[in-house]
UniProtKB/Swiss-Prot annotation:
GO CC terms of this entry: cell surface; cytoplasmic vesicle; plasma membrane
Changes after translation: N- and O-glycosylated. Phosphorylated on Tyr-620 and Tyr-636 by SRC; these phosphorylations promote endothelial cell adhesion and migration.
Native source organism of the sequence: Mus musculus
Biased composition (Low complexity): 490-501
Protein name: Complement component C1q receptor
Membrane topology: Single-pass type I membrane protein
Tissue localization of expression: Expressed in lung, heart and bone marrow. Expressed at lower level in ovary, whole embryo and fetal liver. Not detected in brain, adult liver or thymus. Highly expressed in peritoneal cavity and bone marrow macrophages. Not detected in epithelial cells.
Length: 644
């Protein structure tokens, strides 16, 4: 049989090993439009990918359960080459990796990993255990299986992630890797009508005699007869018409009149018919037709072989051998026109906020604080958190787009870790000063002012003025049944000075004793429950209702409204105190100035006196005359009783 020059050149190329081609043993499985090879070798993931690239492939993908079975078949063949093996777990690299910095997404099937050969994520996964959540290092995936057991179709190899390894340390339990090679089509294996042997050499340097499908551009070496008298023929798998691949041969190979149809059905795919002279021919069953190779049968219905993949449906063209593929909703045909791929609807931005693409469909998601709306839930509307029966805020709640915030009544501030609680403001401890003239008592959301004995609370509820001192406290009037009034009249614990300006502290804190504080001058006083300490039993308190303003100071309530001249009396009293203080300070300054002038003059006189010159006479003094006249008398007077 003649062979073209191009075929000889191809054979020459195939006869030379490719640079870097794997010299290790391997197993090959071809199906559909791809071939899978399994290899022994303790390599890092990067080295394994390089070995696959050298022959035009990539580390294998496992995008479906069907593809997982093809990979398992390759591993089964590979394990037979070294049987028996010891019982241990072995790992084989596949083309699933996660780059450094890409974190794990446990809610997705792929968990943030992607295929090195490209392609979209798929819904299929078969993880051995939970993935590491660390994003610091690159991670790679291998198939893990017990090397001593024959892989079972119901137990597909699990995915195991680990560090990608280095040439010096390829990884723990790494035994090999799997490659995948894609082709535009496949040829059927050559069928022999008599004794002989067929050896296939693939474009990725695999040599085997057992392939269920032979990839495009492979060469078949056919040796007919026994080894001593063998006849060799070479055939090339090529594409006759778009989508149709064959070897370019006609009739069965290695036919022998001695065997006829009894040997391998004469090499025919379906029926074999023998002639009277020892010859035979191939035929097809009803509904099929014999192809040009005179061996293979093809259905007259082009859709009988289900050429459409990816969920596509085949539709034959009437009175023709042609067909078309149609995809389900959410899918479209790729460039081959026979495979359906998912449509990414999110590229058209159909959602108001976030869009999540799924296989054959998509769904919209809303941000926190929003909820889906619209007929297809493609829109998002704000969630009114404040409208709920259980408002998240202790007091006021203000809704905003996608969120909310809490507010508090006057006299309170927002508090809590989530800023939903309200805490009372202690106006009496304000760093800017006491809002009262004398005593200050904090209450929930407000405060009250009081005065020491002999003083009365001014109508404005802040200042204290001289008033009538009562010798005993009147009894407390009956309590009102209104809970709000009762709450206002209760005095919280506080420290109370016994005089205006806080000159003396009272250490005892206010307790509920049932006392009623009042004055004979109309004030804003209200019933108040406080404790009068035993050591200061003569202390008298005059308290008035007082509410804080936004500036931190206070203003009287409507109960404290009085005439304008009453406020003026309090102000005049304060002015009197201020003027008296100024006069006293001025007198002290005048006195200090006079003392200073006196001391300066005295010092100046002493300085002049020290500088005055002295004469010699200043060191002598005159003897009194009386002393001179008496000296002779005292010196020479005779002694009584003597003659002198």
């Amino acid at each position: 049989m003649a062979i073209s020059t191009g075929l000889f050149l191809l054979l020459g190329l195939l006869g030379q090993p490719w640079a870097g081609a794997a010299a290790d043993s391997q197993a090959v499985v071809c199906e559909g439009t791809a071939c899978y090879t399994a290899h022994w070798g303790k390599l890092s993931a990067a080295e394994a990918q390089h070995r696959c690239n050298e022959n035009g492939g990539n580390l294998a993908t496992v995008k479906s359960e069907e593809e997982a079975r093809h990979v398992q078949q390759a591993l089964t063949q590979l394990l037979k080459t070294k049987a028996p093996l010891e019982a241990k777990m072995g790992k084989f690299w596949i083309g699933l990796q996660r780059e450094k910095g890409n974190c794990t997404y446990h809610d997705l099937p792929m968990r943030g990993f992607s295929w090195v050969g490209g392609g979209e994520d798929t819904a299929y996964s078969n993880w051995y255990k939970a993935s590491k959540s660390s994003c610091i290092f690159k991670r790679c995936v291998s198939l893990i299986l017990d090397l001593s057991l024959t892989p079972h179709p119901s137990h597909l190899p699990k995915w195991h992630e680990s560090p990608c390894g280095t040439p010096e340390a390829p990884g723990n339990s790494i035994e090999g890797f799997l490659c995948k090679f894609n082709f535009k089509g496949m040829c059927r294996p050559l069928a022999l009508g008599g004794p002989g042997r067929v050896t296939y050499t693939t474009p990725f340097q695999a040599t085997t005699s057992s392939l269920e499908a032979v990839p495009f551009a492979s060469v078949a070496n056919v040796a007919c007869g026994d080894e001593a008298k063998s006849e060799t023929h070479y055939f090339l798998c090529n594409e006759k018409t778009p989508g149709i691949f064959h070897w370019g041969s006609s009739g069965p190979l290695c036919v022998s009149p001695k065997f006829g149809c009894s040997f391998n059905n004469g090499g025919c795919q379906q029926d074999c018919f023998e002639g009277g002279d020892g010859s035979f021919r191939c035929g097809c069953r009803p509904g099929f037709r014999l192809l040009d190779d005179l061996v293979t049968c093809a259905s007259r219905n082009p859709c009988s072989s289900n050429p459409c993949t990816g969920g596509g449906m085949c539709h034959s063209v009437p009175l023709s051998e042609n067909y078309t593929c149609r995809c389900p909703s959410g899918y479209q045909l790729d460039s081959s026109q026979v495979h359906c791929v998912d449509i990414d609807e999110c590229q058209d931005s159909p959602c108001a906020q976030d869009c999540v693409n799924t296989l054959g469909s998509f769904h919209c998601e809303c941000w926190v604080g929003y909820q889906p709306s619209g007929p297809k839930e493609e829109a998002c509307e704000d969630v009114d958190e404040c409208a709920a029966a259980n408002s998240p805020c202790a007091q006021g709640c203000i809704n905003t787009d996608g969120s909310f915030y809490c507010s508090c009544k006057e006299g309170y501030i927002v508090s809590g870790e989530d800023s939903t609680q309200c805490e009372d403001i202690d106006e009496c401890s304000d760093a800017r000063g006491n809002p009262c003239d004398s005593l200050c008592f904090n209450t929930d959301g407000s405060f009250r002012c009081g005065c020491p004995p002999g003083w009365e609370l001014a109508p404005n509820g802040v200042f204290c003025s001289r008033g009538t001192v009562f010798s005993e406290l009147p009894a407390r009037p009956p309590q009102k049944e209104d809970n709000d009034d009762r709450k206002e009249s209760t005095m919280p614990p506080t420290e109370m000075p016994s005089s205006p300006s806080g000159s003396k502290d009272v250490s005892n804190r206010a307790q509920t004793t049932g006392l009623f504080v009042q004055s004979d001058i109309p004030t804003a006083s209200v019933p108040l429950e406080i404790e009068i300490p035993s050591e200061v039993s003569d202390v008298w308190f005059e308290l008035g209702t007082y509410l804080p303003t936004t500036s931190g100071h206070s203003k009287p309530t409507h109960e404290d409204s009085v005439s304008a001249h009453s406020d003026t009396d309090g102000q005049n009293l304060l002015l009197f105190y201020i003027l008296g203080t100024v006069v006293a300070i001025s007198l002290l300054l005048v006195l200090a100035l006079g003392i200073l002038i006196y001391h300066k003059r005295r010092a100046k006189k002493e300085e002049i006196k020290e500088k005055k010159p002295q004469n010699a006479a200043d060191s002598y003094s005159w003897v009194p005359e009386r002393a001179e006249s008496q000296a002779p008398e005292n010196q020479y007077s005779p002694t009584p009783g003597t003659d002198c």
